[in-house]
Structure formats: structure tokens, C-alpha cells
Amino acid sequence: MNASRASFSAWQTYLKERSPLPVIATIGLLQSLSSNYLFRQELDGAGILMSTACLTFLFILMRLMDEIKDHQKDRIAHPERPLPRGLIAPAQMRSAIQVLIGGLLAVGALLFLLRSPESGAALVFTVGYSLLMYKEFFCPAFINKNAFFYAFSHQLILIPMYVFSVAMVSPEAAFTARTLWFSLTGLGASFAFEVCRKLDPDAHPILRTYLALHGRTACVLVIVLALGLLSVSAWQIGVQNLIWPAVGLLILFLPLVYFRPERFKLIEAASAFVGLVQLLSVTVDHFL
């Protein structure tokens, strides 16, 4: 019993530090709400709640997978994290990954049969893609040749995730052009944040950040390209009036990469704001 309590406490600590439930559940909820209002005027409460729950567990699953993949690097660069410091053993984490995969696949099958084939298929596909990411697409040497290519291959999972959240409330519209553009707003915002959060000029070399591997100009160029994708996609679904000012704000901070690189946290914060606006945009536009 004491061992069970200790294990439960360890997982509580892990979630608090690496996958804070209030944060990731809020992200899932905001995505689900915007997915609802992308095609609907009324609120599908049950669909939104189920979508939020599934997205939350997907976020937890992908974080666990990253913890395992980054274990050796974290032992050197981030020994304070749960896995390197021994709070949870790698075997326990792998077991949790297996349980989550099995549970999400079972939910996907039930959704396919009881909710809509589109939602179930999208969830199963997303879980399958996360497995490919976990295994680095069975060609780790190839996808690790370029850090940006590696990141992009992993960011692509957002497309089926957005298709899933739309399919939960509007299954007939899950595979339409509007849904694709909506998912591309998520991809653009997320990819920009992914690069912006790894601009620390003093990061440990073993972390192989985008800045260390490719330099400042390449990082800025990729961020601008991601923001371009976000901006065009936002225009396609009619939320550019909300998205473009946030994009402009982030662009104003980008010169810090050259002139005040130690202020990289400001760029990260601005990119997080862009991500928040993207998540809220369709919902806010609905009520304007």
C-alpha cells in the first residue's frame, strides 16, 4: 500500500512538473471550443468535453514519449527533471506509454462505432502517428540530419489532432478545406513557438538547439515562414483580424535574436501569446 501511495505521489509530482493538467486541459478545451465554432453556431457540450479529454491524454502521451527520448540528454543538461533524478523509472514511464496508447486506441474504436467514424479514425490515426514519432519514423539517422526537418515531422501531428477535434462536433466537415486551413493555423503557431522557445544562447551544447545548430538567421527565417503559414491560414478561415496583430507583435521582438540574445524569453513569451490567440481566434470571432 505504501509503495502504491509513493508511486501515485511520484506521478502527481511528474504531472505537476512536466504535464500540468490545468494548463494542458485548458489548451485542449480552447482547441475544442474553436473546433466547435468553426462550423457550428450552437455548443456541443458533450463533444467538446470528450474532445478535451482525449486531447489532454494525447498531450500527456507525447510528453512521456519525449521524456524517454530525451532521457540521456536530460541526465546532463537537466538532471533536476523527474526521470533523470529518479522520481520515476524509465520502465514505469514506458508502461504508462503503453497504457495510454491502449486506452486511446480503445476510445478511438468506441468513438468510431458510437460517435462517428471520422472522430474515431482521426484519433486512431493520431495515436499511430505519435508512435511513429516515438520511434523516429524508424529512420532516426535520416530525420536527425536537420533539426528543423525533425521538428516539422513531429509538428505535423497537429493536423490529425485538429481534424479529430472538429470531427467530434462536426464529423461531416472533418475532411474539408476549412478544417485543413484551421489545422494549419495550429501548425504555424505551434512551429513558431517550438523554435522561439529554444533560442537560449547559453543552452547546454548537448541540447543541440536550433540556434546552436543553424544560427540566428536560419532561426528567424523559419519563424517568419511559420508565421506566414499561420497568417495565410488565418485569412482563409476569416480570423486574420485577430491573428495578424499578434503575429506582428512577435515579429517586432525577433531583432532581439541579433541585438539582445539574452532576452530570448521575451521572444518565447510573444510566441506563446501568438499560440493563445490562435487557439482562441475562432471562438472569439464567433462572439464578435
Residue ranges and their predicted role:
Residues 56-67, 127-139, 159-164, 182-203, ...:
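Transmembrane alpha-helical segments that form the membrane-embedded catalytic/substrate-channel core
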Residues 7-12, 16, 92-170:
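Intramembrane alpha-helical segments
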Residues 1-68, 95, 138-145, 154-157, ...:
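Topogenic membrane-insertion module of multi-pass membrane proteins
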